From Swiss-Prot:
InterPro entries: 60S_ribosomal_eL6, Rib_uL2_dom2, Ribosomal_eL6_CS, Ribosomal_eL6_KOW, Ribosomal_uL6_N, Translation_prot_SH3-like_sf. It comes from Mus musculus (Mouse). Component of the large ribosomal subunit. May bind IPO9 with low affinity. The gene is Rpl6. PANTHER family: 60S RIBOSOMAL PROTEIN L6, LARGE RIBOSOMAL SUBUNIT PROTEIN EL6. This is Large ribosomal subunit protein eL6. Residues 17-28 have a biased composition (Low complexity).
Length: 296
C-alpha cells in the first residue's frame, strides 16, 4: 500500500553473535586505555639531552657573559663551605742574650761589669769584600747527578783523545763517584796503567770485552788516585844549590793492584782474535779521513 514502508528483506544476525562482536570491539579500546595510563598516574618525562644554558653564537663565544650567567643560574644562592684548617700558634723563640753581667773584684771597680758574649773582630779588612751568598737551586759538585753515555758500558774499548796517552785504546772498567771513568790499557799491551779519564775526551767504540767476571778492588776510588802534593825542600846553611826536589814514585800498592786487574782481563783479550793488536795500535787521522763520517 501507498505510504507504508517496504518490508526489510535483509536477514538479521542472531543476538549472541552481536553481543560477542560488541565484546570483541570493546577489548582493543580497553587495552589502548591501559597502555596510556601510567601506574603512578603521571606521564613519564622524556629525558632531555644535557646542554648549556648559554647558547653559542660563534665557536668559543656564548650569548651571555660570565656575570650574566651567574645571575641567570642564581649561583649567588649557593652556600660554599671552605675547608677548616687548624692554625698552630707560633712558638715564641727564646731571646739570645747579647751581654752578661760579671762580678769584678776590687773596691774601685764598681763590683759588676757588662761583657758582650759575641766579641767583635780584632782586625778588619782594608778593602770591602762582598760576601758570597749561597744561591738557591745550585748544589755543590759532590751532590751533582753522575750521568754516563749510553755507548759506554763496562768492557767497552775507548779511544783517549787528550793527555799523555792520547790516541791509545783502553778498556773501560767502571764509573767512579766523581763521574770520571776508570780505565786500563792493560799496561802489558799499550803501557796505559789504571787511571781516571773524563768521558768528554773519549770516543766509545763498538768493540767490547766481556769483564762480567772481573773483580775490581773496592779501594780503587777517587781518593786512591788523588795526586799528592810533593814537599818543597827547605834551604839550610851551605846547601842552597845542593837541595833536590822530591820526585813522584809509584807505590807497591799500585803495582799490586795493576797486576791483579790485568791478570783477569788479559785472558779475555787473548781469547778474541786480533783484539790484542787492535789495543796495541794507536788511533790517528790521515788525509781524507773525516771524524764525523767514521764508524767506530
Amino acid at each position: 500500500m501507498a505510504g507504508e514502508k517496504a518490508p526489510d528483506t535483509k536477514e538479521k544476525k542472531p543476538a549472541a553473535k552481536k553481543a560477542g562482536s560488541d565484546a570483541a570491539a570493546s577489548r582493543p579500546r580497553a587495552a589502548k586505555v591501559a597502555k596510556k595510563v601510567h601506574p603512578k598516574g603521571k606521564k613519564p618525562k622524556k629525558a632531555k639531552p644535557h646542554c648549556s644554558r648559554n647558547p653559542v653564537l660563534v665557536r668559543g663565544i656564548g650569548r651571555y657573559s660570565r656575570s650574566a650567567m651567574y645571575s641567570r643560574k642564581a649561583l649567588y644562592k649557593r652556600k660554599y663551605s671552605a675547608a677548616k684548617t687548624k692554625v698552630e700558634k707560633k712558638k715564641k723563640k727564646e731571646k739570645v742574650l747579647a751581654t752578661v753581667t760579671k762580678t769584678v773584684g776590687g773596691d774601685k771597680n764598681g763590683g759588676t761589669r757588662v761583657v758582650k758574649l759575641r766579641k767583635m773582630p780584632r782586625y778588619y779588612p782594608t778593602e770591602d769584600v762582598p760576601r758570597k751568598l749561597l744561591s738557591h737551586g745550585k748544589k755543590p759538585f759532590s751532590q751533582h747527578v753522575r750521568r754516563l753515555r749510553s755507548s759506554i758500558t763496562p768492557g767497552t774499548v775507548l779511544i783517549i783523545l787528550t793527555g799523555r796517552h792520547r790516541g791509545k785504546r783502553v778498556v773501560f772498567l767502571k764509573q767512579l763517584d766523581s763521574g770520571l771513568l776508570l780505565v786500563t790499557g792493560p799496561l802489558v799491551i799499550n803501557r796505559v796503567p789504571l787511571r781516571r779519564t773524563h768521558q768528554k775526551f773519549v770516543i766509545a767504540t763498538s768493540t767490547k770485552v766481556d769483564i762480567s767476571d772481573v773483580k775490581i778492588p773496592k779501594h780503587l776510588t777517587d781518593a786512591y788516585f788523588k795526586k799528592k802534593q810533593l814537599r818543597k825542600p827547605r834551604h839550610q846553611e851551605g846547601e842552597i844549590f845542593d837541595t833536590e826536589k822530591e820526585k813522584y814514585e809509584i807505590t807497591e800498592q799500585r803495582k799490586a793492584d795493576q797486576k791483579a786487574v790485568d791478570l783477569q782481563i788479559l785472558p779475555k783479550i787473548k781469547a778474541v782474535p786480533q783484539l790484542q793488536g787492535y789495543l796495541r795500535s794507536q788511533f790517528s787521522l790521515t788525509n781524507g779521513m773525516y771524524p764525523h763520517k767514521l764508524v767506530f
